């Protein structure tokens, strides 16, 4: 059981003070004209992860000036990390209901996050009929319900549902490439990610996906671009960075959680890949995200006359 950092002051992502230091957060934002959520979100520097957004009812306005575009029921948007967020209810609509999922992707999702239609860096696609809108509504709702369930593996199950949503989006995008990563490579990645604390051998992974070790090694490098052991090390460091940012666990415990029983070896690997020691990374992350002289950033929710910055 991890101990969350005390900086997160309240658990509602629609209200100020919520920390998005998680792999997955999902919700529904029901904006009504003159209601408590009727303001424009303004995040000039974006967020650390992605947000995928589905308009269910009404109309939303994205950006202003020459870059303005609007989203209607069935429109999907994908905001990449660090991309500018400026959006709210369209003045010509009395409401904007949109489902959303904030997430930090698994490494092998990269191709699924390259949407081919974009406006100012924001991925866009439209579901062509109401049947698809209802299907995607259920996918978003299932992710939210699972993520909030408090079940033992709620985050992992939510990520698996999100994976399905992203693949369905690719299927419905007429401009997406026909070739998607081999499902055996995807399964190998999932198996490795689920067992980061252990020392899985390549032959164990190969047996899990019903391939020979040599065939898996060749296929993995061909489709992912690096070998299996290097990819596993990447995932361990990514997981360690998140735990350093969002928990109060000791560095030794975090090392063990991601597969390094020797704290000194963990620190050496971390420094080699990140450029600083785990303790320095935690300190710098805390200083950046929670500076002592400033209040917590607003996320999703404080009503002011024109916009909310975060």
Curated annotation (Swiss-Prot):
GO terms for molecular function: DNA-binding transcription factor activity; sequence-specific DNA binding. It is found in: Cytoplasm. GO terms for cellular component: cytoplasm. Pfam families: AraC_binding, HTH_18. Residues 203-224, 251-274 bind DNA. Residues 186-284 form the HTH araC/xylS-type domain. Keywords: Activator, Arabinose catabolism, Carbohydrate metabolism, Cytoplasm, DNA-binding, Repressor, Transcription, Transcription regulation. Alpha-L-arabinopyanose binds at residues 13, 29, 43, 87, 98. InterPro entries: AraC-bd, AraC_XylS_family_regulators, Homeodomain-like_sf, HTH-like, HTH_AraC, HTH_AraC-typ_CS, Tscrpt_reg_AraC-type_HTH. GO terms for biological process: arabinose catabolic process. Transcription factor that regulates the expression of several genes involved in the transport and metabolism of L-arabinose. Homodimer. This is Arabinose operon regulatory protein. It comes from Dickeya chrysanthemi.
